[in-house]
A protein has these predicted regions:
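Short, structured beta-strand segments at or near domain termini in extracellular proteins/domains
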Residues: 189-199
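Short amphipathic alpha-helical face segments that pack within enzyme cores
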Residues: 12, 57-60, 194
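Non-catalytic surface loops within mature trypsin-like serine protease
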Residues: 9, 91, 154, 197-199
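Functional-site microenvironments in short loops/helix caps that host divalent-cation chemistry
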Residues: 36-177, 184, 189
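A short glycine-rich, aromatic-capped structural motif
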Residues: 1-33, 53-54, 131
């Protein structure tokens, strides 16, 4: 299996849109931080992880390139490796050389560039796994609900939302599930994705 070294960036997603001419059937909240009139992202966002995409949006992107989203256990493997380390980089506590600075407030600040913290790389060189954005993985469906497993963790928590998540939630033993309701509701500013490819 080949794993993308970084989450998909705004520049990569823009290139995909130009090549594929793809637009989702339901575009509520789709690329909400981009300019809807000309399809551009804000200045300086080229290397930031693309967000405001649903699980379906991410799946379509991966499939277009002959790839797919990782299963949760695959994500765990390339993040944690065979030694059970608590963090991608090993056993040292998180700091701002390895993950972005945590913020808590009313405004959702942009994520860091995907290559901003090389000291946070995993045992196999995969970067930006925790502390920047959640990452889409598996979907589990039963007779009445669908849930996606979110791996990694974001750099921001809304003010007064201690229920949102403990932070820093960077330990690889933890994950969140996301109740999927509709594409428009599933898109948010704290979840990105990376692709894997079977070989």
């Amino acid at each position: 299996m080949l794993v993308d070294k970084y989450p998909v960036t705004n520049a990569e997603y823009q290139d995909f849109l130009r090549k594929s001419n793809w637009i989702p059937d339901l575009d509520v909240n789709w690329l909400r931080d981009w300019n809807a009139e000309n399809g551009s992202f804000p200045d300086g966002f080229e290397s930031k992880p693309v967000v405001w995409l649903s699980h379906q949006d991410a799946t379509f992107y991966c499939n277009y390139y002959g790839k797919r989203l990782p299963h949760s256990w695959e994500w765990q493997w390339f993040a944690q490796g065979p030694d059970g380390r608590p963090y991608p980089w090993g056993y040292e506590d998180p700091d701002e050389t390895r993950i972005p600075k945590f913020t808590n407030g009313r405004q959702h600040p942009p994520a860091d560039n995907v290559d901003a913290h090389p000291l946070g790389a995993s045992w196999c060189g995969i970067e930006d796994l925790v502390g920047n954005v959640y990452q889409w993985t598996d979907v589990f469906t039963d007779e009445h609900t669908s849930r996606a497993v979110l791996r990694g963790s974001p750099h921001w928590r809304p003010s007064g939302s201690h229920w949102y998540q403990p932070f820093p939630n960077t330990a690889l033993s933890e994950h969140n599930t996301y109740l999927l309701m509709s594409e428009g509701m599933d898109r948010n500013g704290g979840t990105g994705f990376r692709c894997v490819q079977d070989v």
